[in-house]
Swiss-Prot record:
Pfam families recorded: 2-ph_phosp
Disulfide bonds listed in the record: none
Keyword Calcium in record: no
EC number(s) per entry: 3.1.3.71
Gene3D superfamilies in UniProt: ComB-like
Reaction(s) the record says it catalyses: (2R)-O-phospho-3-sulfolactate + H2O = (2R)-3-sulfolactate + phosphate
Name the UniProt record assigns to this protein: Probable 2-phosphosulfolactate phosphatase
Cofactor: Mg(2+)
Chain's gene name: comB
Family: Belongs to the ComB family.
Keyword Repeat among UniProt keywords: no
Organism whose genome encodes this protein: Clostridium botulinum (strain Loch Maree / Type A3)
Length: 239
């Protein structure tokens, strides 16, 4: 199994994704939100690029819609929820459709439409994601959503942890240089939150008093489901 990493949503080459399995990672916080919402019984998540698109879907849909998302880590005016996974509890999302728009994560998802299979991962479900990848048994591209088109330490080290989870299942992994680097960084910094504390996006969230979000997002493997993006929306994968 060949594994490569793309460092941000802006670095996605759509042609490279054809017939590939893709994993989208945005641990702070979009993929943590999506994984949490699906785990708590959300019917589906619709990732969109713009605020206007999200509002149009809510206006025209006959489904029970929750609008969620952020711009520059802040809740969008008129939306029900921000991009905090702690808000997407079973009480509020069970049986409902979440329309989500974020600065980085939903852009990475939508830019990956050419891929054969698209799975959503974060630290909170990495082991479950690794098991799904093993079952698929196909070459893999891990897409880090990044921060405003730039490299993000938090997504990168999460990729390294996901690779480590895969190594615990199988040894026939062929890593690109960047994938080797991510794995090396994780194996030498297994206390991920301590390593990431000086990262730009971490500091931004901390400055907004979102420490509880950070604590939640840096937990490993507290959720056993893997969301899958297909045909414009995200549901619980059956892989």
């Amino acid at each position: 199994m060949n594994i490569d990493i793309v460092i941000s949503a802006d670095h996605i080459d759509e042609k490279r994704l054809i017939k590939k399995t893709v994993i989208i990672i945005d641990i702070l916080r979009a993929t943590s939100v999506i994984t949490t919402a699906i785990n708590n019984g959300c019917k589906k998540v619709i990732p969109v690029l713009t605020v206007e698109e999200a509002k149009d879907i809510a206006k025209n849909s006959k489904e029970d819609i929750i609008l969620g998302g952020e711009r520059n880590a802040l809740k969008i005016d008129g939306f029900n929820f921000s991009n905090s996974p702690l808000e997407y509890t079973k009480k509020y999302v069970e049986g409902k459709t979440v329309v989500l728009s974020t600065t980085n994560g939903t852009r990475a998802i939508n830019n990956s439409f050419n891929a054969k299979t698209i799975l959503i991962s974060a630290l909170i479900n990495s082991k479950a994601t690794a098991k799904a990848i093993d079952k698929l048994n196909e070459d893999l591209i891990i897409i880090n959503s990044g921060t405003n088109g730039q490299f993000s330490i938090d997504d990168f080290i999460c990729s390294g942890y996901l690779i480590d989870c895969l190594y615990n299942i199988r040894k026939d992994l062929e890593l690109s240089d960047i994938a080797k680097t991510a794995h090396y960084i994780y194996t030498n910094n297994k206390d991920i939150e301590s390593f990431v504390k000086k990262a730009t996006h971490y500091s931004r969230l901390k400055s907004l008093n979102l420490e509880k979000d950070l604590e939640y997002c840096f937990q490993k493997d507290i959720i056993g489901v893997v969301p899958q993006y297909k045909d414009g929306y995200i549901i619980k994968s059956n892989i």
